[in-house]
Amino acid sequence: MKAGRGTLGVCLAKQSQGGDPDKLACGLKKRSQKRNPSPSVVPSWTDQPVADSHGKSRATGAAASEMKHGQSKASLLHHGGFKVLQSLKGSVGRSSAPAASLGKAVALSPAPSEEQLAGMSHGIGDALGSDWPGREPRATDNRGQYLKGESWVSGRPGHPKLREVGFLRGEPPSAGPKGLGTWSELSHRYFELGQLPYAYPYYKVLPEGELRCVSLDRFNPGLSEETVEDEKTLKFFRWSADSRGVTGSAIFQISKSLMP
């Protein structure tokens, strides 16, 4: 610069004083090439930058803004899952948390892992097992499973509905099934069924001459008949449990004498 004027201003001044326009243009081109790098080296997005009021290139500012926005999105994707899980955990931990906040946390959270699902199922099962209205807490082992032999009706001792259908509190009799898929004939009509979950709301009492049975919620009864010595009909009831605390299936055999 000379006297505060740029190269273009100097050339125009010389031309006005009678200088050769071709020589002035050639000199202007050479000076521009010395000050600026080769066009092949300069990226295309920097061609013809427009200076803003602060003297910065708008293209450079746009590139920096885009890079910052990309970093923010990457940070959100990386840490967003952890923050949402923490929010969900806090909402579940507070019994007075609004349902709306929990719904938002669930809607924003990614798909839970198998361990998280197992933990949620375990917590729900414990709550239902111990806080059921009107029941006594049942004993569990160190893994939260109900102890073998713990009666499902222990929280309802002597309930009239259980007595009416013939189910008593306690373990199955010695003549009952010993293992999964095995059975033996029961000589008496009334027997103890210790692993029956809350049958009294679904009881059904038949006439005295008929078999007494119970319709259980969440159970799929399957009935098969077999004639033995033309005197007795054996009916086998198979229940496959899908609720917590009942493992596998139990087959119980109820016998009824057809003799008068």
Curated annotation (Swiss-Prot):
**Which Pfam families does the UniProt entry name for this protein?**
FAM220
Tell me what organism the protein belongs to.
Mus musculus
Where is this gene product found? Nucleus; Cytoplasm; Cytoplasmic vesicle, Secretory vesicle, Acrosome
Any idea what job this protein has? Promotes dephosphorylation of transcriptional activator STAT3 by interacting with both STAT3 and protein phosphatase PTPN2. This promotes interaction of PTPN2 with STAT3 and mediates STAT3 dephosphorylation by PTPN2, leading to negative regulation of STAT3 transcriptional activator activity. May be required for spermiogenesis or sperm function.
In its keyword annotation, does this UniProt entry include Chloroplast?
Answer: no
Q: Where does it sit, as one GO cellular component term?
A: nucleus
Query: Which InterPro entries does the entry mention?
Result: FAM220A (IPR040355), SIPAR (IPR029155)
Q: What is its main location?
A: nucleus
* Gene name in the database record: Fam220a
Skewed-composition ranges (Polar residues): 35-47
UniProt keyword annotations, A-Z: Cytoplasm, Cytoplasmic vesicle, Nucleus
Q: Where is this region: Disordered?
A: 1-75, 129-158
UniProt protein name? Protein FAM220A
Give expression by tissue: Expressed at high levels in the testis where it is detected within elongated spermatids during the late stages (steps 9-16) of haploid germ cell development and in the tubular lumen (at protein level).
Q: Subunit details for this protein?
A: Interacts with transcriptional activator STAT3; the interaction occurs in both the nucleus and the cytoplasm, is enhanced by IL6 and promotes STAT3 dephosphorylation, leading to negative regulation of STAT3 transcriptional activator activity. Can interact with both unphosphorylated and phosphorylated STAT3 but interacts preferentially with phosphorylated STAT3 in the nucleus. Interacts with protein phosphatase PTPN2/TC45; this promotes interaction of PTPN2 with STAT3, leading to dephosphorylation of STAT3 by PTPN2.
**Taxonomically, which superkingdom?**
Eukaryota
**Which is an annotated GO molecular function term of this record?**
STAT family protein binding
Q: Name the Gene Ontology biological process terms.
A: intracellular signal transduction; negative regulation of transcription by RNA polymerase II
